[in-house]
Amino acid sequence: SNPNFILTLVNNVPYTIWPA
């Protein structure tokens, strides 16, 4: 129920795939 949590996940997904 925390929007920030979802936003953090979405923003961290690309970095998890390609840490560049």
From Swiss-Prot:
The keyword Secreted applies. GO terms for cellular component: extracellular region. Keywords: Cell wall, Secreted. Its main location: secreted. It is found in: Secreted, Cell wall. The keyword Secreted applies. This is 23 kDa cell wall protein.
